[in-house]
């Protein structure tokens, strides 16, 4: 609502990015008797921070981890990527919440199924098949055209620079986006 009011005044909208990762963390008052603070620490806290920084790259307001997707079966998610972020040895699969399952139209289910197939081809290094599907999605789903064109561009770069690299599908964000 505030963002809309600002736009009505000709000001830029307020945009925020939220990253959500699910897992165990230590939360509470920590420190010494001279300096106490209420904080949260743990792997999911750090991962959520990295995911929050990814929101700008994908032009989204919310990015969640695979651990979160597993805990919310009543929601549909669109897989965004597999990334390597600073501070993590394991790769992180990123997702975007789409809508509650019961609210999804047959057309949306069909597009998400096609998207899932494109992501599967991409992860398997089947570049031609993945590029074909991402190009189709970019034409058919204009609201996500830029997102899908990122994949088409990445595939073209992979083909010319490292076509045999088994980890080429993993986006290395350890040195990008404000030192993720």
Annotate the PLM regions.
Residues 14-20, 155-158, 170, 177:
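Weak global preference for isoleucine
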Residues 25-27, 54-129, 135-167:
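Cytosolic regulatory/linker segments at or just downstream of nucleotide-handling modules
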């Amino acid at each position: 609502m505030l963002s809309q009011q600002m736009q009505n005044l000709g000001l830029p909208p307020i945009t925020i990015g939220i990253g959500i990762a699910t897992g165990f963390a230590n939360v509470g008052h920590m420190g010494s008797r001279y300096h106490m603070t209420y904080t949260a620490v743990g792997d999911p806290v750090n991962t959520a921070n990295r995911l929050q920084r990814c929101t700008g790259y994908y032009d989204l307001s919310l990015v969640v981890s695979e651990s979160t997707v597993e805990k919310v079966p009543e929601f549909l998610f669109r897989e965004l990527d597999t990334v390597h972020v600073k501070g993590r040895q394991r790769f992180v699969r990123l997702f975007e919440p789409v809508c509650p399952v019961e609210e999804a139209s047959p057309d949306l289910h069909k597009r998400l199924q096609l998207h899932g197939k494109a992501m599967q081809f991409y992860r398997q290094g089947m570049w031609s098949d993945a590029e074909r599907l991402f190009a189709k999605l970019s034409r058919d789903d204009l609201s996500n055209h830029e997102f899908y064109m990122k994949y088409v561009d990445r595939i073209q770069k992979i083909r010319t620079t490292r076509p045999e690299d088994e980890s080429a599908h993993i986006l290395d964000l350890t040195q990008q986006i404000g030192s993720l």
